[in-house]
Amino acid sequence: MYRKPPSGPVHGRTFTQEARRAQIVEATIETLAEIGHTKTSFTAICRHANLSSTGLISYHFAGKPQLLREVTRTIVEKAGSLRTSRVAQEATYRGKLVAYIAAHFDFMARYPAHARALTEIAELVREQPVPELDDVARSALSVEALVALLEEGCRAGEFRIADPPVLALAVQGALDNVVRHHELFAMADLDHLARELTDIFTRCTLSP
């Protein structure tokens, strides 16, 4: 689903400071999911987290871009961890591809606010350049892990794919659009959609 982005600095922070940063990040995720990126401000996040002052956020994050960078890193890391765990359990490359796709839907089901927040950040980056988010945005959009899986499957003789990077982009594009469509139309049967997409893309791996 995603490549793990660069981690932010953690040296020199106390346990209490780390806990407060985590609280702010989670509150930002929930705020983004509820009211969108255009309305998400330090004031709105304070209300959501019951913080007494926006200064508490400013103490840990220099500005909104820095905070959104940490939010993106947190979401991408969580999604990547879930995907890696699911894929690692499979012995075949077909099984790994199925697990890769299933992990995307599993993440949406387990962490709907995180999925929505990441979509909001992606929309923000599309609307206006945010230099502080460049590297984490690239990480969120990366298909490197999926390309590697498909190429390894080809080398193992399980897949016959003419251009793994193109298929990886098709898979990821479909998965990303599912998130946006689900948010707009609240599709109830995600399990059915997961099965259909899995069937479509596993068939593609058998094409000469």
Protein language model regions, located:
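N-terminal intrinsically disordered/low-complexity leader segments
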Residues: 1-19
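C-terminal peripheral helix-coil segments that are non-catalytic and often amphipathic
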Residues: 1-7, 106, 140, 144-155, ...
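Amphipathic alpha-helical linker/stalk segments
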Residues: 12-13, 69-99
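Generic hydrophobic, amphipathic alpha-helix propensity
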Residues: 20-29, 45, 67, 71-79, ...
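Helix-turn-helix
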Residues: 23, 35-66, 70
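Short hydrophobic clusters on alpha-helical segments that form packing/core surfaces
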Residues: 24, 28-32, 104, 201
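Amphipathic alpha-helical packing segments from all-alpha helical-bundle domains
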Residues: 77-85, 110, 119, 128-156, ...
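Hydrophobic alpha-helical connector segments
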Residues: 84-114, 167-171
